[in-house]
């Protein structure tokens, strides 16, 4: 008799998941991709009544739980996802893992190194997963396709990764916790976490040293604990260079929340990703890849509808079969660790 594949097993078993923490809009995209990948959303909870009501409008058929414990005690649920207040995410994840479930959390996953260390202990004790939705790669077709091209050697050996993640602030729409350092962690540990994960992924590095990190509040004195600019320089364990810059200065005139780009330099060429838009307006939509190599003119690839978001199906399969094909736990947590180290470096050198 032919043995079933992991993918077939995943379809047969169909993973049920719940939500704990609805404090950031990212949770809706996370749920959408998990459902599209075959997951079944069965329940949701947030301690804030308004957040629960908003979620119920978007998912009217999903049960709104009366408490966090109701979800943790539900033996039919094997995965919990969430986007709680950033400083609360690790503690929720610890409770989730101790209840025998895997945890899939919005970035940034931590605000302190002590949270990271405690999570590592609980992972070792429980054998559960603490996975992070680094959406600037995992929900970007240009990024996922670029990863394939790099593995094919399109630009030779990767020498440097440069990532830029500007964001639109839209301050009136932000909750109060968003501007409190203890709760959001700082601009590097928040939105720059995407860049650290991509540095590791695109370069193949497994560790790095923080050379320099800086944060500033250039233009928002009304929010004294807020940081509207951050930059970091890294050197990978194998010598690869990394530079990343994030800010909250996307102007209202831009047709996107941010002109997110990355440049990857190799021995035989370079690659540029324009993730959200082509600012020239010449190419509609997002997910643009430009590759320039020795002896060949610049090649343009529109990655839209080319690859989808393959992480999510692979992650569901990993949860069911206890594998690590979507992303290793070591990679996930190393990105978080470097992010926190850089934030700490910047905080100490203000």
Regions found by a protein language model. Give the residues of each.
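Hydrophobic residues in well-ordered beta-strands that form the structural core
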Residues: 105-106, 130-132, 273
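Contiguous beta-strand/loop segments that form the cofactor/metal-binding neighborhood of enzyme cores
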Residues: 197-280, 311-322
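Mid-domain beta-loop-alpha active-site segment that forms a flexible
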Residues: 133-141, 172-208, 224-228, 331-332
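Beta-loop-alpha module in the N-terminal Rossmann-like domain of NAD(P)-dependent dehydrogenases
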Residues: 27, 59-122
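N-terminal Rossmann-like dinucleotide-binding module
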Residues: 2-3, 9-59
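C-terminal helix-rich "cap/oligomerization" subdomain common to oxidoreductases
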Residues: 3, 19, 79-81, 237, ...
């Amino acid at each position: 008799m032919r043995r079933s594949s992991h993918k077939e097993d995943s379809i047969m078993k169909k993973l049920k998941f719940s939500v704990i923490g609805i404090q950031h809009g990212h949770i809706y995209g996370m749920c959408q991709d998990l459902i599209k990948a075959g997951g079944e959303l069965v329940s949701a909870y947030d301690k804030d009544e308004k957040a629960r009501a908003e979620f119920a409008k978007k998912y009217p058929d999903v049960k709104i739980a009366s408490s966090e414990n109701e979800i943790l005690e539900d033996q039919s649920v094997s995965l919990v996802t969430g986007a709680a207040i950033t400083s609360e995410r690790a503690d929720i994840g610890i409770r989730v893992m101790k209840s025998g479930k895997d945890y899939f959390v919005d970035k940034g996953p931590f605000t302190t190194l002590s949270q990271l260390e405690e999570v590592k202990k609980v992972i070792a004790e429980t054998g559960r997963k603490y996975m992070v939705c680094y959406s600037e790669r995992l929900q970007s077709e240009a990024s996922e396709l670029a990863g394939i091209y790099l593995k094919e050697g399109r630009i030779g050996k990767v020498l440097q990764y440069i990532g830029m993640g500007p964001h639109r602030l839209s301050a009136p729409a932000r909750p109060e916790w968003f501007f409190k350092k203890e709760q959001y962690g700082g601009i590097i540990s928040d939105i720059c976490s995407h860049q650290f994960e991509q540095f590791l992924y695109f370069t193949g590095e497994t560790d790095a040293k923080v050379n320099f990190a800086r944060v500033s509040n250039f233009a928002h004195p009304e929010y004294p604990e807020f940081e509207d600019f951050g930059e970091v320089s890294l050197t990978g364990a194998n010598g690869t260079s990394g530079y990343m810059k994030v800010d909250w200065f996307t102007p209202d005139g831009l047709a996107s929340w941010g002109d997110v780009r990355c440049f990857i330099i190799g021995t035989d060429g370079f690659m540029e990703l324009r993730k959200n838009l082509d600012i020239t307006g010449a190419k509609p939509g997002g997910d643009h890849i430009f590759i320039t190599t020795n002896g060949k003119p610049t090649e343009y690839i529109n990655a839209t509808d080319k690859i989808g978001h393959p992480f999510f199906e692979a992650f569901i399969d990993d949860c069911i079969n206890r594998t690590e094909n979507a992303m290793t736990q070591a990679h996930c947590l190393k990105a978080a660790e470097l992010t926190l180290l850089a934030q700490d470096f910047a905080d100490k050198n203000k």
